[in-house]
A protein has these predicted regions:
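C-terminal helix-rich "cap/oligomerization" subdomain common to oxidoreductases
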Residues: 17-24, 34-57, 391-394, 532-607
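NAD(P)-dependent dehydrogenases' Rossmann-like dinucleotide-binding region
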Residues: 67, 234-252, 376-387, 443-448
Length: 607
């Protein structure tokens, strides 16, 4: 997102951000950051609880993790044993079960993201872990048996998207709390059914059910600080946000097109088995390995053997299907292992990637509302398609969107950073969209394959400053568009502003010290807060991404897919959003999904 910036410009932006955050807390929550530093509550050791206002729980919530693939294992890595006790996992794949215990040994960075239950819970080995963690798969009743386990109070769902809604509904029907991965559901009607069930349901103790969705930016401290700086007025009047998620995936090198266990046929009739080939390579290297390489290769071989064992699973027994697209035939194995590539099991780039960043956009714009409600877009133009990939999928590999959001109304005391004496403008408060339909915030979004330049992130532009959020870990702040000047915060008439004269000696501010250690992307905090809400069932306690918020994100993403479909069928890539789509109690949907039909589907047993 910031590839055009030099290292010096990046460092200036980081220090400007830390200076501004320190000033914000000195003015608004004096000694908050200094208290965090003094008590050692930094990084994963309590920073989230301090920022987001939740405490410890006396009795960790007993949970099951249903779906322990890539994302499920990231969520296992976010399970703090002081808040949740993982009593069961559920997955049909030996590969997923193995990583749930041992973590992902494919690379050092993968093992950090997916450390496994043995590491997370402090077990000595898999045998000890299995004494405390029951494994559900096709041999012992799978998902249905897991949901009926009397020792389970709540479930984390990290299954392929098409299974989010039915498993969540079956869990809530059994009085279980739910945290499901994003997107909330496969279509908008499913989201509304889930939201209604959560509102009407109770847990086994008669307390409200908590249905949370894993848009983890709601629990990212960097995003929370960004919101505070926006509210404080340092960016002035927001008018444009640019966001992207660009990846270098190419044919033959696509992270969403995973190898098929057991291999697959090539055009020459031969079978290519990438997993077996990699396994043989590691076994050969082990024969001559010495020192630390022996242990590393043994761990990798165990993981690849589990991956190879996935060939014993028949996906057709679990709802996956063989199907055709034109003359191209696809197998149920492809639909299971590459579910993101197909519309029946996934919902494409906007669901998997775009929903995260449009959620961030909504967080930024909603922060300026006085009523606390989520901002909804007015319209979207979308184009895209399958521009570089072969016909090995029915989901596109490029999408470009332009969203119009209503501009917020600013308080009369809010300093927008400009005044025209000739026009006497602004004369009082800068109006919002409801007072002046010209007041809009335009958001451009692209998610592409084939070139990863810029990576992923968001750039928020206002009349006084620019805020860059890069890959969820770095935040850069600049006065206007000046990327070279060191700035601090100066109090002016009407508010606060970035100013070069207030930059001080640029020593490491308290905010930087408080953010030492690995940057949390919010997974740990979202699970901790969900558990805290379960154990503290007061009305004011609810997850930050509760059903109305998560459904709003789904409407935005799935609505963009409707606009994209319009562009591909000669109707023009446009969609005007309707407020009733965002109302859980209204049956209207943008994607043609039907409430009654989804209710019947969602309460059927799943395999």
């Amino acid at each position: 997102m910031v590839d055009k910036l030099s290292n010096d410009e990046r460092e200036v932006g980081k220090q400007n951000y830390y200076n501004a955050v320190t000033s914000y807390y000195d003015v608004n929550r004096r000694d908050f950051l200094r208290g965090i530093v003094a008590t050692g509550a930094v990084s994963g050791a309590g920073l989230g609880a301090a920022y987001f206002g939740y405490g410890q729980v006396k009795d960790p919530v007993r949970i099951a993790v249903i779906g322990t693939g890539d994302e499920g294992n990231v969520l296992i890595g976010g399970c703090n044993p002081n808040y949740v006790d993982v009593k069961a996992i559920c997955d049909i794949r030996p590969f997923s079960q193995h990583r749930a215990f041992h973590g992902d040994c494919s690379s050092p960075s993968a093992l950090i993201r997916r450390p496994g239950l043995i590491s997370v819970a402090g077990y000595s080995n898999e045998a000890e872990a299995r004494k405390n963690v029951k494994v559900y798969d096709s041999s012992n009743g799978g998902i249905m048996a897991c949901l009926d386990d009397p020792d389970i109070e709540a479930v984390i769902i990290a299954l392929p998207l098409w299974l989010h809604a039915p498993v969540a509904a079956l869990a809530m029907e059994r009085n279980l709390h739910v945290l499901t991965e994003k997107l909330m559901a496969h279509n908008v009607a499913q989201c509304k059914v889930m939201g209604r069930m959560a509102a009407a349901g109770q847990d086994k103790n008669g307390n409200p059910l908590h249905l949370a969705t894993g848009h983890q930016r709601h629990y990212n401290v960097k995003y929370e600080n960004a919101v505070n700086l926006i509210r404080w007025g340092l960016l002035g009047q927001l008018h444009h946000i640019r966001a992207q998620w660009h990846r270098g995936n190419l044919p033959g090198r696509d992270s969403w097109s995973m190898p098929i266990p057991g291999g697959e046929k090539m055009p020459n009739g031969k079978t290519f088995d990438r997993i077996a080939k990699d396994l043989a390579h590691r076994r050969a290297k082990l024969k001559t390995a010495t020192g630390a390489d022996v242990k590393r290769l043994q761990a990798e071989i165990a993981q690849w053997e589990a991956w190879d064992a996935d060939k014993t699973i028949d996906p057709r027994e679990h709802g996956y299907e063989d199907f055709a697209r034109g003359d191209q035939m696809f197998t149920a194995e492809e639909e299971l292992h590459r579910w993101r590539l197909f519309q029946r099991t996934g919902a494409g780039l906007m669901a998997e990637l775009g929903s995260h960043q449009l959620d961030a956009v909504s967080i930024f714009l909603s922060s300026l509302r006085s009523d606390g409600k989520k901002v909804h877009p007015l319209s979207v133009h979308a184009v895209g398609g399958r521009h570089i990939m072969p016909l090995d999928r029915d989901a596109g590999d490029h999408i470009y969107c332009t969203f119009e959001f209503p501009g917020p109304e600013y308080a009369e005391t809010f300093d927008v950073g400009y005044y025209d004496p000739v026009e006497n403008y602004p004369n009082g408060a800068v109006p919002g969209y409801e007072q002046d339909p010209n007041k809009k915030v335009v958001v451009t979004y692209s998610t592409i394959n084939g070139n990863g330049f810029g990576g992923w992130g968001e750039v928020v532009m206002g009349t006084k400053g620019t805020l860059v959020l890069d890959k969820e870990t770095d935040v850069l702040l600049y006065r206007n568009s000046d990327t070279s000047s060191k700035v601090g915060v100066k109090k002016e008439e009407g508010g606060y502003a970035l100013d070069t004269s207030a930059s001080g000696d640029f020593a490491a501010p308290v905010a930087q010290t408080a953010a030492t250690g690995p940057v949390s992307r919010g997974y740990r905090e979202e699970i901790e807060h969900w558990a805290y809400c379960i154990r503290n069932p007061d009305k004011e306690n609810k997850p930050r991404c509760y059903p109305e918020v998560a459904m709003g994100d789904a409407v935005i993403a799935l609505g963009a897919n409707v606009a994209l479909k319009n562009s591909q069928t000669g109707k023009g890539g446009y969609l005007q959003y309707k407020e009733e789509w965002f109302d859980i109690d209204n049956d209207a949907t943008p994607d043609g999904s039907d409430i009654k039909r989804e209710q019947e589907y969602m309460l059927k047993d799943v395999t």
